[in-house]
Amino acid sequence: MKWVTFLLLLFVSGSAFSRGVFRREAHKSEIAHRYNDLGEQHFKGLVLIAFSQYLQKCSYDEHAKLVQEVTDFAKTCVADESAANCDKSLHTLFGDKLCAIPNLRENYGELADCCTKQEPERNECFLQHKDDNPSLPPFERPEAEAMCTSFKENPTTFMGHYLHEVARRHPYFYAPELLYYAEQYNEILTQCCAEADKESCLTPKLDGVKEKALVSSVRQRMKCSSMQKFGERAFKAWAVARLSQTFPNADFAEITKLATDLTKVNKECCHGDLLECADDRAELAKYMCENQATISSKLQTCCDKPLLKKAHCLSEVEHDTMPADLPAIAADFVEDQEVCKNYAEAKDVFLGTFLYEYSRRHPDYSVSLLLRLAKKYEATLEKCCAEANPPACYGTVLAEFQPLVEEPKNLVKTNCDLYEKLGEYGFQNAILVRYTQKAPQVSTPTLVEAARNLGRVGTKCCTLPEDQRLPCVEDYLSAILNRVCLLHEKTPVSEHVTKCCSGSLVERRPCFSALTVDETYVPKEFKAETFTFHSDICTLPEKEKQIKKQTALAELVKHKPKATAEQLKTVMDDFAQFLDTCCKAADKDTCFSTEGPNLVTRCKDALA
C-alpha cells in the first residue's frame, strides 16, 4: 500500500495511533459499573489480587475481610448509584481502604506516608512501594491428600488462598491472567481429587500450570517496566510489532487500533487498576471475536471458549498465514523518492507503518530484534534526511540490518548447541559461570536464580522448529534479564549490570551478551566454610541439591574469576563424587566431617 493511502486513512479516521475500540459512556458510580460488568466472582477475585499486590505482608484473612467490605459496598452502589461515596473513583475507594489498615506504619514503614497524599499521587506512591522480591517464605505446595481435603471443604476459600499467595509474591502479575490460572488450578483439583492416586494426577499438572504462570509473571513485569521507564509509546511499538507478526493479514489501521487498546489494558493493570484492566480486556476480546474477518482466520477456536479461556487463548493464538503477494519492503521505505517527506510529515505513523510492514514479514524474528531494526531505521532517516542527497545515504539501510539480525541468530545457535550437549542442569551451570564472571559483585542467590531461569530457555525454546527459536529465546531472555535489573536497582553493586540496565529495554540482552570478565573485580578470599557440607544435603529434593551445588560453583568463580572451564569441571566433578560417596556411606556424618576438609584442600589446589 502506498504511503499516500496511509495519510488518507489517517485523515478520514482521525489518528490511527490514538483511537481504539473502547467507547464507554461515563457512569455515575464506577464501582457499580465494574461490578455489573465483571460479575461477583471475578470482581471479588480482582479486588483480592489488588489488595494482595499492594499490601504484601497481610494475611489472607485480613485481605478477605477487606474484599468482603468492598464487595458489600459495590452491591450498595449497584442498588442505588447515588448512595453516599458511590461516585468516588476506584483509586480513592481502594486507597482509603488501604490507609485504614490498623498498624500500617508498624508493618509497612514508609508506605504509610503515601496516605498523606491526594489522588493520583497517593496511588503512584503505593505503586512505588510494591516489592518485586518480598521477604516471604517460598510457597510450599501441601501434600495431595491435605490439598484435596481443603479444596473439598471450601473451594472458594482454597482458591482465594491461591490468588493471595501468588499475587503478593508477584505484585505485577497480570490480574485477568491470574484469574485464568486460578481457574486452571480449580479444574485440575476437581479432576484429580476424584482419582485414586491423587499425587500422580496432581503433580505434573500443577507443575505445568506453575511453570506457565511464572513465565507469564516475568513477561508481564517486563511490560510494566517498559511502561514505567519509557512510557506508552514504547509499549505501543512493542504491541504493533507483536500484533503484526500474529495478524499479518490485518491492515495497519486495525493493528494500531488493537495496539492502542492493548496498551490501555496493560497500563491499567500495571497501575493497579485491575477492575478496569479486566473489564477492558474482556471488551477487547469481544471486539476481536466480532471482527475476525479483518483480523485473522485463526481466532474462531479461541472465540468459542468462555471469557477467561478466550482472552488467554487470543493472547497466545498462532500466527495467521502470511499474505503471498507482499511487495518488497524497499519499495515504500527505501526506493520511494519521498521517504524523507513522508517521514517528516508524520514521524510516528511512518515509523509505525515500517514496523508493521517489517514485522508481518518476519514472524521468525523476536519483537526485541524488530524494535532494534526500527530504531536503526529511524536513526538512519534522522541522519540522512538532513544531508544533501538523502536517497544515496539511506539506500543501503536494509543491508545494514544484517549484523543486527546475525547477532541473535548466532546467539541462538551457540546456546542451543550447548544446551543439546550439556542438558538443562549443565547448561544452567555454564550460564552461571558466564554471568558470575561478567558481574561477580552481584549476590550469589541472585546469580543462581538468574542462571537457573536463563538456563530453562534451552528446554523451553531449543526443541522448537527453527523459525520459532529466535523469538522464543530472545524474548524469554529479555524478560528474565529485566528481573535481574529490577533486583539490581535496589542494591546496585556492579557497574557492568548498571550499564546494561540503564539503557533501552530492547538493547539489554545484546548488552549482557557482550559483557566480558569484569577486570575491576577483586577476587573473594577462599573460605572453607563456603564449601563445607553436611549430611542433610543427602535428603534434599533434587532441585535444592542443584541450588546448593550451583551456589558453591558461583562462589568458586568469585574466588577465581579467570578459572578455566577445565579447572571448574575438575572441581565440580570432584564435588559431585564427594556427595555421591558420602550420601551412600553407612555413617554419613563421619564421611562428611572427614572427607569434607580433603575436598576443600583439593579445590584450592585445583584452582591454584
Curated annotation (Swiss-Prot):
Residues 1-18 form the signal peptide. It comes from the Eukaryota. Disulfide bonds join 77-86, 99-115, 114-125, 148-193, 192-201, 224-270, 269-277, 289-303, 302-313, 340-385, 384-393, 416-462, 461-472, 485-501, 500-511, 538-583, 582-591. Ca(2+) 2 binds at residues 37, 279. One of its GO terms (molecular function) is oxygen binding. Keywords: Calcium, Cleavage on pair of basic residues, Copper, Disulfide bond, Lipid-binding, Metal-binding, Methylation, Phosphoprotein, Repeat, Secreted, Signal, Zinc. The modification N6-methyllysine is found at residue 558. Ca(2+) 1 binds at residues 30, 268, 273, 276. The modification N6-succinyllysine is found at residues 229, 460, 543, 588. Its main location: secreted. Residues 19-211, 212-403, 404-601 form the Albumin domain. Phosphorylated by FAM20C in the extracellular medium. Cu cation binds at residue 27. Gene3D superfamilies: 1.10.246.10. It is found in: Secreted. It holds the Pfam family Serum_albumin. Plasma. Expressed in the granular cells within the cerebellum. InterPro entries: ALB/AFP/VDB (IPR000264), Serum_albumin-like (IPR020858), Serum_albumin/AFP/Afamin (IPR021177), Serum_albumin_CS (IPR020857), Serum_albumin_N (IPR014760). Zn(2+) binds at residues 91, 271, 273. One of its GO terms (cellular component) is protein-containing complex. One of its GO terms (biological process) is cellular response to starvation. The modification Phosphothreonine is found at residues 444, 446, 570. Belongs to the ALB/AFP/VDB family. This is Albumin.
